[in-house]
Regions:
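Sequence-structural signature of the catalytic-core scaffold of metal-dependent phosphohydrolases
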Residues: 2-42, 50, 54-65, 85, ...
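A short small-residue
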Residues: 65-75, 368-373
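Low-complexity, highly charged intrinsically disordered N-terminal segments
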Residues: 78-81
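Hydrophobic (often cysteine-bearing) scaffold residues that line and stabilize catalytic clefts
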Residues: 83, 131, 135, 153, ...
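A residue-level signal for conserved active-site and pocket-lining positions in enzyme catalytic cores
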Residues: 157, 390, 429
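C-terminal subdomains that position terminal phosphate/3'-OH groups for nucleotidyl transfer/ligation
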Residues: 280-420, 439
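C-terminal amphipathic alpha-helical interaction region
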Residues: 402, 407-449, 453-454
Length: 454
């Protein structure tokens, strides 16, 4: 679901941020670093991007980062890694449906579109910190209140692939040089940029989401990405497809996980029990103001989404994890996904940001997820503890920076002032998996002994 730009029709420097456009640049497949492509390499530049992402440290860490339900709870639940893989599969499916509908006229190099969307999907969650939404909120609140800075998962993903991931390094006139992250092509970087405006613009416009931090390294790469003119920054078609795939994967698959875990009372939702409808509608009012005129509208959406289950035996009572119930749940989620894929590619064109019926469906499904998986009262203690871990890790590393990795890089920012020092620490904490963050916190504060690395 696309975020509203900081001001109507504006991006980081005054361009149109809400307009998605095809990738029309002479050097769309250029990289910032020196390219030494092997002559016998059969891969396209975007396929090279995809392979670099898959083999990266940040991608591997997604296997131990929370999607919705904590990775430590049970192995069945999706992690950020499995969500990312499923998102990439849906992105390719949407791309192929559009190309089958003779959509080539609006896409440069249509033969690369599925690979480009897949690469964007694979990279889109690399910047998410430990503990899912709770970790992201904790880091953002900490930065806002203490230093007037921000944390945002999408901007962190951009920072990882353009700076932090140890893959490519550019030698400059100085002996230090500059890390280039994965050194991805312009095409892939543009496709992954869901919010083409900066941290400063987001703060000024009181907008939650943004795509790039306000520091010299990130801004320089962002300017290069748009041929030296960041005012041209805008969403791309591949980026819109990636967002559609992400929202569908998130909305449908987390409903499946929550139902299987018996956290979401699917039978009560199917039966439109008043208490369940009220909780969903109240959450939807808060997270999607103005989308629904009344709670009756939310109930109508629930009836449209779950009405087919009224006559299903497995959904008439609490989920029992029988093979029959598991098959019924899987069939329902598959049908829901197929329906959304059909709607998003209806008429042979991408129907996403302006597809109000589909956006309302997504909003209701996400509201269910927030009610029972993200903000349930039963998880208040766990979320409090996770926020505390995040805050105390940041404080501990700032107090004793000798515990940080990359000490040669820390030496260059140690006396540079709070913004650079703090961002360095945040980069490290955000890179941690759930389990590693908890382990380091225990050792840092003397509640456990041992050694580990990641």
């Amino acid at each position: 679901m696309m975020a509203t730009p900081p001001s109507s029709g504006s991006n980081a420097n005054g361009g149109n941020a809400a307009t998605s456009a095809p990738q029309h640049a002479v050097d769309a497949y250029a990289r910032m670093g020196v390219s030494r492509r092997k002559p016998d390499d059969p891969r396209s530049p975007v396929e090279v991007d995809r392979d670099r992402i898959v083999h990266s440290h940040a991608f591997r860490r997604l296997q131990r980062k929370t999607q919705i339900v904590g990775v430590h709870s049970i192995d069945f639940f999706r992690t950020r890694l499995t969500h990312t893989i499923e998102c990439a599969q849906l992105g390719r499916a949407i791309s192929k449906r559009l190309l089958d509908g003779s959509w080539e006229q609006v896409v440069e190099a249509p033969e690369h579109l599925p690979d480009l969307v897949e690469a964007a999907c694979l990279v889109h969650d690399l910047g998410h910190p430990p503990f899912g939404h709770t970790g992201e909120e904790a880091l953002d609140e900490l930065l806002r209140t203490r230093w007037g800075m921000r944390f945002e998962g999408n901007a962190q993903s951009f920072r990882i692939v353009t700076l932090l991931e140890p893959k490519k390094y550019q030698r400059l006139e100085s002996p230090v040089g500059r890390p280039l992250g994965l050194d991805l092509t312009r095409a892939t970087l543009r496709a992954m940029t869901k919010y083409p405006w900066t941290e400063r613009t987001a703060i000024a416009g009181d907008v939650a989401k943004f795509g790039v931090y306000d520091n010299a390294d990130d801004q320089a790469y962002f300017d290069w990405l748009w041929d030296g003119d960041a005012s041209r920054a805008q969403r791309t078609i591949a980026g819109d497809i990636m967002e559609a795939a992400d929202d569908i994967a998130y909305a449908v698959h987390d409903i499946e996980d929550g139902t299987w875990a018996r956290l979401i009372p699917i039978d009560q939702i199917v039966q439109l029990e008043p208490w369940a409808v009220e909780r969903i509608a109240t959450l939807a009012d808060r997270r999607y103001p103005g989308m629904f005129a009344s709670h009756a509208d939310v109930e109508a959406e629930l009836r449209a989404l779950f009405g087919t289950l009224v006559s299903s035996d497995w959904a008439r009572g609490p989920f029992d994890r029988s093979r029959r119930s598991e098959g019924g749940l899987k069939s329902f989620c598959s049908a829901l996904t197929d329906d959304m894929l059909r709607r998003v590619t209806e008429g042979g064109t991408l129907c996403w940001n302006d597809n109000e019926p589909l956006q309302r469906h997504i909003a209701v499904l996400k509201s269910i997820i927030w009610v029972w998986l993200i903000e349930p009262p039963e998880l208040v203690t766990r979320r409090y503890g996770q926020r505390r871990i995040i805050r105390q890790l940041v404080d501990g590393f700032l107090d004793e920076p000798g515990m940080l990795p990359y000490q040669d890089e820390w030496a260059r920012v140690a006396d540079a002032g709070d913004p650079q020092r703090v961002r360095f620490v945040i980069d490290h904490v955000a890179s941690m998996t759930d389990t590693y963050a908890a382990m380091v916190h225990r050792e840092m504060y003397g509640t456990a002994m041992g050694a580990g690395w990641e």
